[in-house]
Amino acid sequence: MELKFSAEVELTLSREVDPAEIEPTVEEFVKEANEDLLQRGVPTGKEGAKIESYRVLEDTIEMEITGTRYLRPHEAAMRVRKRLAERLGRKHRVGVRDLKIPRYEVVLRFDREVTRDDVGYVPVADDVVVEDGTVRLTFQDVDEEMLRRHVIDRVIRLVAWAVEERSELVERVTKVEPGTVVDESGPREIRFDGDVTEEARRRGWVKEFPGRGQWIYTPPMAALFEVLRDFLLERVTRKLGFEPALFPKLIPLETMFRMRYLHGLPDGMYYVCPPKRDPELFDDFKRELYVWGELNERTLGSLKEKLRDPGYVLAPAQCEPFYELLRDEVVDPERLPIKLYDCSGWTYRWEGGAAKGLERVNEFQRIEHVWIAEPEEAERIREELLEATKRVAEELELEWKVVVSDDPFYLEGRLLEDRDIELPDVPSYEFEVYLPFKGERSSEEAWISVGSFNVHGEHFVDGFNVKEKSGRTLFTGCAGLGVTRWVVGLLAQHGFEPEEWPEPILERIDEKFGGLPEVPKTLTWPE
């Protein structure tokens, strides 16, 4: 990719001057700057920046500056401002009070045809023109904050990523091709091929909640959920030495920003808008609600006016508080690894139209394992969790496979990061079980992930400024066992008759509940 830059620059003087008086000084400076100042730091044989033209006014010096990837016009302008101010101060007792860039243009030339759809939405840019293999970005009134925060550099990186790198993001990090099956149980006898959601609904084990992707789980389903959760905790979590923790499920946006989750999956979360704490402010909403007698555009519009901007999300990953626990801390290697788990509540993801049945919901429960350790041990912990999960699936006589994941949730969030961090060869594995009612084994649609096993490398260590006292590398990891989906997987393969269920489940249901609880029936439900 070839880059070219040009900028209109205005240097505001500290007082009005006679242009003829200072123009010789400016002319001399421009010549010297083009030969030396604007070439410093540029590799031999490459071009830096250049002041193409200038004009001296009574209170302003206007310049047209071009640049390359080695020295961009805004960087050149800041050099010019400092050095020219020093020279004008010595010779004419006038300084440079302000730097403005009314217009900044960036041209990106690619080696292939580029369309406007390839580029996509470009924040901050006032104009985007795409012709053949060229993308021309124009920015108006660039201020110092934009320069200080490297906003234009980030826009360039965003466009380059969108055109050249987006489809390669996972492949660049994952050394094994996503979708590769690394282990599997092999086929098992199919005992049930009915639709789990429809059968559970018919029996009254679940009832659909008004919210999309939400269900009420009645006693038979809840009992099965509890014993499966306890079985996983016993055979996997506690057996491997994970300690309990209670993590908040209302997560500040700042935390999601640090995780780079906002960069990667902003459309997959529920956002929380706290109300303005003023009861009188809500009086007109209550009156609107009373008069209209329903939730409509008018009543909801009145409510929206009383809400603050989004400040939180409902936990979409469940591991978020672990990184806040470690934030800005120094870790003692003698106390590693730190291994915690949380299974204290719901996890929320907005699936939108993809929410379907019990197998893909917006609200679900998991056992979330989190850990921090030195790299080799961090990966070993993941392997131990995977092996323990396989043993559980075997005890439950489930058909399963382990697949290299194609969607480590944090990777896309690194697209604007220039820092080089260490990552494992395979960031993420998915543990999937077969759902016979969804189709043949050869169809990816017939498999559902019941566990995700991730080693993040230094991603969160870097984002949350976690240090090891001797400066050694630390990795974090997380592994979520989706208990709600384990229930679906067991019912999909073994059916709804308890006598067909694996012995470990039956024993625990009898021990804990004295048998499978009954559905709380009414005169009209279940049908």
Curated annotation (Swiss-Prot):
Per the annotation, how and in what number is the cofactor bound?
Answer: Binds 1 Zn(2+) ion per subunit. This ion is coordinated with 2 cysteines, 1 glutamate and a water molecule that dissociates from the zinc ion to allow the coordination of the amino group of the serine substrate, which is essential for catalysis.
- Give the pathway listed in the UniProt entry for this protein: Aminoacyl-tRNA biosynthesis; selenocysteinyl-tRNA(Sec) biosynthesis; L-seryl-tRNA(Sec) from L-serine and tRNA(Sec): step 1/1
Residue positions annotated to bind L-serine are: A317, R349, R366, I367, E368
Q: By its UniProt entry, which InterPro entries does this protein fall under?
A: aa-tRNA-synt_IIb, aa-tRNA-synth_II, aa-tRNA-synth_II/BPL/LPL, Ser-tRNA-ligase_2_arc, SerS_tRNA-bd
**Molecular function via GO:** ATP binding; serine-tRNA ligase activity; zinc ion binding
Recorded coiled-coil stretches: none
Keyword annotations of the record: Aminoacyl-tRNA synthetase, ATP-binding, Cytoplasm, Ligase, Metal-binding, Nucleotide-binding, Protein biosynthesis, Zinc
Query: So where does ATP get bound?
Result: R349, W350, E351, R360, V361, R485
Q: Which residues bind Zn(2+)?
A: C319, E368, C478
Q: Which Pfam families match?
A: tRNA-synt_2b, tRNA_bind_4
GO cellular component terms, semicolon-separated: cytoplasm
Q: Keyword Calcium, does the record have it?
A: no
- Family annotation (SUPFAM superfamilies): Class II aaRS and biotin synthetases
Report the EC number(s), separated by commas if there are several.
Answer: 6.1.1.11
Annotated compartments: Cytoplasm
User: Which CDD domains does UniProt cross-reference here?
Assistant: Gly_His_Pro_Ser_Thr_tRS_core
The main location class comes to cytoplasm
Q: Provide one Gene Ontology biological process annotation.
A: seryl-tRNA aminoacylation
The cofactors required by this protein are: Zn(2+)
- Subunit and partners: Homodimer.
Described function: Catalyzes the attachment of serine to tRNA(Ser). Is also able to aminoacylate tRNA(Sec) with serine, to form the misacylated tRNA L-seryl-tRNA(Sec), which will be further converted into selenocysteinyl-tRNA(Sec).
* Family classification: Belongs to the class-II aminoacyl-tRNA synthetase family. Type-2 seryl-tRNA synthetase subfamily.
Q: What is known of its domains?
A: Consists of two distinct domains, a catalytic core and a N-terminal extension that is presumably involved in tRNA binding.
Q: Which NCBIfam families match?
A: PRK00960.1 (NF002120), serS_MJ (TIGR00415)
Annotated protein name in UniProt: Type-2 serine--tRNA ligase
